[in-house]
Amino acid sequence: MVVLAAVAEFIPGLAKWRLLGQTPNGATAVLPRLAEHKPSVGESALTEESRGDSSNSRPETTRPASAAGVIAATQGAAVSADSVESKPPPVHLEYSQDRALAHFYQALKRTSHTEAAFTTRVVHFGDSLIASDYVSGTLRRLLQKQFGDAGHGFSLIANAWPSYFHEGVSRFATSGWLVSRVVGPYAQDGWYGLGGVSFRAPVNTLARVGTSTKGEFGRRVSRFELAYVAGPSGGAIRVRIDEKTVGELSTQRDEKAFKTARWQVVDGPHEIEFLTTRGTSRLFGVVMERDVPGVVLDAIGIQGARLRFLDQQDDAHYATQLKWRNPDLVIYEFGANESADGLAYSLKDFHDTMKAVVDQQKSAIPESSCLVIGAMDRATRKGDTVTSSSFIPLLVAEQRAVAQEVGCAFFDTYQAMGGRGSMPRWVRRGLGQADLTHPTAVGADIIGTWIYRALMERWQ
């Protein structure tokens, strides 16, 4: 069973399921390398069931883990997201244009005034952190606590990666899905849906998505929406809600087209199930929303992704996905994999491709606000010497420059952490993982809280 990496950080018996990090008793973990880009066209089969239910969920209030291991030889002062939630963030949002977040704040104003159950929507793109709902899960929870829970938003139909997980939603899918991703293997037509993953489902492939049974958020839903492709090679899907069959969805059509199907339910706890009964259907993901004022945050995490990989999508199809969700705020949080590339991919190319991706977004949904979250500090260890990467400040400078150029707000995570040398300190305090690249669940909670507080500074 796939278990959320964050849970494994707190339970020694689940150490093998950790996304990245330390093993018990101070041993150094065997860590997967940051994903390298190996382009190919085709599909890979998911051989494991997808599970993500309330029993796996991270607690809504997390506490620091112990800092065991050769790097974290001494335990630093305990820090939790609780201790920073009511304080100003260590850095403020940067703007090149005063109205960089005006549309987002206007949407929040309409939501806070309960205007006809107005929903403020956020799409949060990122790499492996967001794939496990790190940072994004905290930001969703805090925004919904302040402005209302309007539903979980988008999640993939199945787990495209073992570490894929979303807070506040229950999910299950059988094995057997055939998958193409923007990180490879590629789809021939460049159609990956909002989540950057295309799933083909042979007969008797099943997926279920439902409300959470634990915690304050994600407990109710008013409607489900399935994103799929209809076309000549489509099939049929039996749809059940709360274990009752509500009909059959045909995914056949003379010409290929992106489609969505909605099912309205009485606001409350519900579960929807999709079972392919004929032919092969191509699906992307499911949206859960409510007919109440509040915030919805779609966490679009792609393991191994660089921001430029979003441009692997067919341009017209990608624009259709953005227009479908029509977010009031688009967030980009990348940098870990780009930092692994170093200067093998030039800073000019990084700048140009990042700008091209954001320009695509602004062309498709010109009214939406955007926020770039800068890369974290990263370090390497040789023997007893730990050194922060000299490339990170260069990468952050390009992220800031693009944000200024295209009119996005910018949050400098690197400086918020403490700048050069901060990741080793984070590891000693239980906030950074042993790979010296990723935060722990608690560290991610703190970053998410900082971003929320930075957004609320201007709102207030």
Residue ranges and their predicted role:
Residues I130-D352, H438:
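Conserved SGNH/GDSL esterase-like catalytic core that processes O-acyl groups on lipids
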Residues N326-S339, K348-K355, Q360-S363, L371-F410:
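Conserved N-terminal glycine/acidic-rich loop preference
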Residues F10-S80:
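Juxtamembrane proline-rich low-complexity "stalk" or linker regions positioned immediately after a signal peptide
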Residues S96-R110, L310-W324, D352-Q360, L394-V396:
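Alpha-helical scaffolding within the catalytic cores
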Residues M1-P12:
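Hydrophobic membrane-insertion alpha-helices, especially the h-region
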Residues W17, D315, D377-Q460:
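Catalytic His-Asp segment of secreted/periplasmic serine-dependent ester chemistry enzymes
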Residues F125-S128, I157, A299-Q303, Y332-N337, ...:
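Active-site-proximal beta-strand/loop segments in catalytic clefts of secreted hydrolases
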